[in-house]
Amino acid sequence: MPGVETIKSSWADEVELDYGGLPPTTETIENGHKYVTEYKYNKDDKKTKVVRTYKISKQVVPKTVAKRRTWTKFGDSKNDKPGPNSQTTMVSEEIIMQFLNSKEDEKANDPLLDPSKNIAKCRICNGEHWSVNCPYKGTAMDTNLMEKKAAAAASAAVDAPKSGKYVPPFLKDSQKGGMGMRGRDDTAAIRISNLSESMTEADLEELVKKIGPQSKMYLARDKNTGLCKGFAYVHFKQRKDAAAAIEILNGHGYDHLILSVEWSKPQNN
């Protein structure tokens, strides 16, 4: 007896027999791919099967982005699937943001790195560096500076009063002008004006230490802010060094200001 041949029907006929309408959409994940199967009617009013294949890939994102993707949707998109919906969301071009390092911001706001506030000023070439680091140190430019210092010292020695009379040692200090009850000698003291607010005692010492030895220095500061008031007094051990300081520093540019240096006027006790 010949075998009964079974006639295989198409999948569309089987679906039509099993379901009265369109079957539900199914999703399956295999080998790193996602398969979405949907059923719909075409323009000829026939059932069609549409299979979409998606490749699953892992992406490392910031924690804030991952947390934002878990937010619950609301409104018209309340029942939407994860991800953007083309009917309610328009995806624009990707914008890449570059975040600056906080250390770069601190460096930009550091007042010590501001070139307009550079306190270093060379006495030899007027450059923005200390005199000890001057590339012209020991050259003809440095020699001219030393000649000015020697000329100022010589003029101070000529102006000093000369007398052939014997003066006892205990009376020598009393004959110096400006010597008060406290033993302060104002004849070798100078007043430096037009200093910047950022001036410090170390800067003042660096400014005058190569001219000659000093006995005392005083930088006037504001009691409330602690900033320099704009002037200072320097007492040299020898009057010729004080005269040399006036000759060299008066009119000298320092910290973007022009210094004014003169003899300190004796105070009336």
UniProtKB/Swiss-Prot annotation:
It comes from the Eukaryota. The gene is eIF3g1. This is Eukaryotic translation initiation factor 3 subunit G-1. PANTHER family: EUKARYOTIC TRANSLATION INITIATION FACTOR 3 SUBUNIT G (PTHR10352). Component of the eukaryotic translation initiation factor 3 (eIF-3) complex. The eIF-3 complex interacts with pix. Residues 188-266 form the RRM domain. RNA-binding component of the eukaryotic translation initiation factor 3 (eIF-3) complex, which is involved in protein synthesis of a specialized repertoire of mRNAs and, together with other initiation factors, stimulates binding of mRNA and methionyl-tRNAi to the 40S ribosome. The eIF-3 complex specifically targets and initiates translation of a subset of mRNAs involved in cell proliferation. This subunit can bind 18S rRNA. The keyword Protein biosynthesis applies. Belongs to the eIF-3 subunit G family. Transmembrane segments: none annotated. The lineage of its organism: Eukaryota, Metazoa, Ecdysozoa, Arthropoda, Hexapoda. It is found in: Cytoplasm. Keywords: Cytoplasm, Initiation factor, Protein biosynthesis, RNA-binding. GO terms for molecular function: RNA binding; translation initiation factor activity. Pfam families: eIF3g, RRM_1. CDD domains: eIF3G (cd12933), RRM_eIF3G_like (cd12408). Gene3D superfamilies: 3.30.70.330.
